């Protein structure tokens, strides 16, 4: 461990196990990193508010890379980097998906704000439970900033490939992943 300069970790399935917990062995390793003053960075597609409960619960001191790199915060949670699409562009994508009549729920993320048109949708409620964060009922126009870092579409697994392919074909300028 003495030759390590920095350690990066994804959250789901890497840092957290299937029960959404850090194992005792992993936690010991993280505490050793802190003791040796080796920087630890959490990287996730989650929002900052979806990462912070983990940081607080386990007493971690780390920078975070959220939205798969669209927003980077240092240990003091100051913004180091951010890049997203405009609300207008996000609205175009959402309008397109509405015209397709896809059976899905969506959430839009800007810095640490998460909006969705229906907080009572079971798919959104499940996401809230997983990330231990709360969505705000609203639409893109309700977002405080003009920068959208992530659009999340939640659908039945049988629809995922179709929706992904359709969005990639219509919006090749954006990174669309499942």
Identify the meaning behind each predicted range.
Residues 3-19, 93:
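Asp-based phosphoryl-transfer active-site loop
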Residues 103-178:
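Conserved acidic, metal-coordinating active-site core of Asp-based
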